[in-house]
């Protein structure tokens, strides 16, 4: 079961939380859901070069709060904040409500599954050898503190006549363990030979407390910690186990 299901959906309510955080009655639920989908697609398409990891949407009373997690926040903000004001206005027009926009920097894009998948897809589109792109991503993630990573690429790799799937794994990726903090991301590379699909799983350690916000809080705290501090935490968890 853990091998097939989306690892993020599998852990929702345990150590992961939803990217859309709001409640609505039956009459307006569908409309708000489609607004979320439109906003996410718009942000992902409009800010493709900014390295968007995820878009979190919250809806306090008759307002909308959008948090964009980006590896390159400077591209979103623009010169003297001009670009972010334009983006805020466009999102407000989509929701017909007051929209607040927050930008959160992803300090280590090498261990963010969505950004790793996007990076590999961009390399495949530039005709970089898929094995080299995958190995480079694996080495970077392990060097920056990931406890395990698995990458699969599927399609007409290298222009082959018959599509196939290749994968690399290093370290542990325990998909069945619910307390494991596993990040998952996908991307598509539009090559001259057709579309190649990329999937990335990154194991960042175990979360022992039962807290849906634990993974998000840990990511923010991890940006402030150095590698030595993370190693001490990992050793402490192993001793307790």
Curated annotation (Swiss-Prot):
GO annotation (BP), single: translation
PROSITE patterns the UniProt entry points to: KH_TYPE_2, RIBOSOMAL_S3
Gene3D superfamilies given in the database record: 3.30.300.20, Ribosomal protein S3, C-terminal domain (3.30.1140.32)
SMART domains membership: KH
Gene Ontology terms: cellular component: cytosolic small ribosomal subunit
Lipoprotein among keywords: no
PANTHER family: 30S/40S RIBOSOMAL PROTEIN S3 (PTHR11760), SMALL RIBOSOMAL SUBUNIT PROTEIN US3C (PTHR11760:SF19)
Protein name: Small ribosomal subunit protein uS3
Organism ancestry: Bacteria, Pseudomonadati, Pseudomonadota, Alphaproteobacteria, Hyphomicrobiales
């Amino acid at each position: 079961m853990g091998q097939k299901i989306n690892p993020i959906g599998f852990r929702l309510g345990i150590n992961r939380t939803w990217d859309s955080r709001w409640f609505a009655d039956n009459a307006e639920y569908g409309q708000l859901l489609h607004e979320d989908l439109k906003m996410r697609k718009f942000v992902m398409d409009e800010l493709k070069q900014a390295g968007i990891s995820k878009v979190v949407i919250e809806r306090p009373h008759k307002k909308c709060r959008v948090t964009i997690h980006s590896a390159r926040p400077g591209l979103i903000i623009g010169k003297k904040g001009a670009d972010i004001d334009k983006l805020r206005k466009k999102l407000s027009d989509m929701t017909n409500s007051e929209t607040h926009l927050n930008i959160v920097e992803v300090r280590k894009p090498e261990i963010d599954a969505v950004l790793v998948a996007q990076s590999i897809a961009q390399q495949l589109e530039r005709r970089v050898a898929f094995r080299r792109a995958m190995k480079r991503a694996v080495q970077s993630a392990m060097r920056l503190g990931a406890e395990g990573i698995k990458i699969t690429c599927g399609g007409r790799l290298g222009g082959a006549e018959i599509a196939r799937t290749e994968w690399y794994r290093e370290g542990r990726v325990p998909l069945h363990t619910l307390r494991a903090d596993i990040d998952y991301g996908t991307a598509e590379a539009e090559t001259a030979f057709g579309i190649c699909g990329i999937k990335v799983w990154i194991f960042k350690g175990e979360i022992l407390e039962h807290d849906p916000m634990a993974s998000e809080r840990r990511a923010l705290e991890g940006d402030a910690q150095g590698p030595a501090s993370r190693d001490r935490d990992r050793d402490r968890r192993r001793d307790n186990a």
